[in-house]
Amino acid sequence: MISNINLEDKFFSFFFTLGFSKEFFNFLWIIFSILILMLGVTIGVLVLVWLERKISAAIQQRIGPEYAGPLGIIQALADGIKLFLKEDIVPAQGDVWLFNIGPILVLIPVFLSYLVIPFEYNVILANFSIGVFFWIAVSSVVPLGLLMAGYGSNNKYSFLGGLRAAAQSISYEIPLALSVLSIALLSNSLSTVDIVEAQSKYGFLSWNLWRQPIGFIVFFIASLAECERLPFDLPEAEEELVAGYQTEYSGMKFAFFYLASYLNLLVSSLFVTILYLGGWHFSIPFFSLFKNFEWNLMSNGISEVISIIIGIVITLVKSYLFLFISIMTRWTLPRIRIDQLLNLGWKFLLPIALGNLLLTTSFQLFLL
């Protein structure tokens, strides 16, 4: 994809003619970018919830959401309005401060993860040089919020759910980080944009998926465990813990947990696209050369906008294809026991991730 003209500069030239200073424009641009990102992410989550309900209904030979809008497309929005209008109940004997701060501490780190996700070359809120490790760092705060929510509820089921969430996150955060480190070694960068650009030469043939198949499998399993999806939803197992750390929550606080889980799932799928599936680049080898030639025949402004739109669409299509696999996994596999979950993380995934990192390091040293 090409970007001959920066859209931010074009907007600044327009605002400059109206008498706005550079500093004021930068402030407005940051606020505008954050609002657009939050709106887009919220719409993406609503679509994800609708897709999961429809796919699960098809698997179980049901109809699923049908009456709230065409094909039930606004069912998730209706559920959000319902939760907003519900009463907010606080346990009488619980720790009010921990109970209230827990959902916020779970939701904010997930939103911060979207800062380093590039939907296209110029469509990224913060292009940090340590982008992928920034995501791992902020996501490691989430189990602390879950533990606070479980402890503050003064409920044995909630507390056990919080303990399980913390143990599960620690067990699978390390294999996940080692898989990301292997990708960073291949790309010689921790920046998400640089990692995508390193996969841009030969279409799908240059994807890290082919160079890191073991790391991809480890990343896929660990990301499902981090999102607490079946078969790894031990912290909220209904048959054992009622609803886990969410047992005592209602209203908007419960909605925060619900929203955070789907936001986290969408983040994981986007990072799979960025790390292993080439990001916003075309998957057909050498097809991007033809597209560049076609855009050069058009005006610079139009080609810039079209390139950005196509890049965003490609990123989202790849991400939702991975989400489809995650949804099918949830409604296909049974839940495992807590001892099996910990054994899988510490005795299986961690040694494999370490071995994969050792092989990647040896390969990179051999090429020097």
UniProtKB/Swiss-Prot annotation:
Annotated membrane topology: Multi-pass membrane protein
Gene Ontology terms: cellular component: chloroplast thylakoid membrane
Compartments, record wording: Plastid, Chloroplast thylakoid membrane
Keywords: Chloroplast, Membrane, NAD, NADP, Plastid, Plastoquinone, Quinone, Thylakoid, Translocase, Transmembrane, Transmembrane helix
Record carries keyword Protease: no
Entry EC no(s): 7.1.1.-
Any one of the GO BP annotations: photosynthesis, light reaction
Transmembrane parts of this sequence: 27-47, 97-117, 130-150, 166-186, 204-224, 249-269, 270-290, 305-325, 348-368
Matches recorded under InterPro entries: NADH_UbQ_OxRdtase_su1/FPO, NADH_UbQ_OxRdtase_su1_CS
Pfam family, one: NADHdh
PROSITE patterns attached to this UniProt entry: COMPLEX1_ND1_1, COMPLEX1_ND1_2
Superkingdom: Eukaryota
Keyword Transmembrane helix among record annotations: yes
Reactions catalysed according to its record: a plastoquinone + NADH + (n+1) H(+)(in) = a plastoquinol + NAD(+) + n H(+)(out); a plastoquinone + NADPH + (n+1) H(+)(in) = a plastoquinol + NADP(+) + n H(+)(out)
Coiled coil region boundaries: none
GO terms for MF: oxidoreductase activity, acting on NAD(P)H, quinone or similar compound as acceptor; quinone binding
PANTHER family registered for this protein in UniProt: NADH DEHYDROGENASE SUBUNIT 1 (PTHR11432), NADH-UBIQUINONE OXIDOREDUCTASE CHAIN 1 (PTHR11432:SF3)
Record-stated family: Belongs to the complex I subunit 1 family.
Function: NDH shuttles electrons from NAD(P)H:plastoquinone, via FMN and iron-sulfur (Fe-S) centers, to quinones in the photosynthetic chain and possibly in a chloroplast respiratory chain. The immediate electron acceptor for the enzyme in this species is believed to be plastoquinone. Couples the redox reaction to proton translocation, and thus conserves the redox energy in a proton gradient.
Self-association state and partner proteins as the record states: NDH is composed of at least 16 different subunits, 5 of which are encoded in the nucleus.
Name of this protein: NAD(P)H-quinone oxidoreductase subunit 1, chloroplastic
Organism name: Marchantia polymorpha
Gene label: ndhA
